[in-house]
Amino acid sequence: MAFYSTAKKIVRVLLWPFYKVETEYRAELPQEQGYIMASNHVSDMDPVMLGLAFHKPLNFMAKEELFRIPVFNSIIRALGAFPVARGKGDQAAIDHAVGIVKNGGVLGIFPEGTRFKDGKLHRLKSGAVVIAAKTGADVLPTCIRYEKRR
């Protein structure tokens, strides 16, 4: 994950003038075992910002359409993202996610299935619960909010 940690340092420097990344933990995060980080999804920047906020690398389940963009495909794969065919019960994506969590990794997932900019919580998809049931892993509910640096 050398690419991940290098990219994280570069992105932190580039975004620092514009965004203030703060984290608040209500519980101790698991250090050894894998877990599922389930967050709301309000912006294209969410995976980047969450990656900056967490100490362990996040492996995001991302819509398959993103992997059709040639250069972007290579970058997000190198950062640990993997494709999911939304709305199709993508068993290969579920199996991949289960493997990440069982091997001590952190799965990043947006249970609403897409971005919503209205600030409301929308109907959740079942993926996070299915993966938690298959792995016995904890699900860390996460909320992301954006405020510009003043």
Residue positions per predicted region:
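Short gly/ser/thr-rich secondary-structure transition/capping motifs
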Residues: W16-E24, R145-R149
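Catalytic core of membrane glycerolipid acyltransferases/transacylases, capturing the structured
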Residues: F3-A7, W16-P17, L29-K88, H96
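Alpha-helix C-terminal capping segments
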Residues: L52-A53, N103, A133-D138
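Residue-level detector of anion-binding/catalytic polar loops
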Residues: N59, F82, V106, D138, ...
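Catalytic-site beta-strand/loop segments enriched in glycine and acidic/polar residues
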Residues: I100-A128, T135
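Short secondary-structure boundary segments
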Residues: H41, E64, G113, T142-E147
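A cross-family acyltransferase "interaction/gating" segment
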Residues: L29, K120-R150
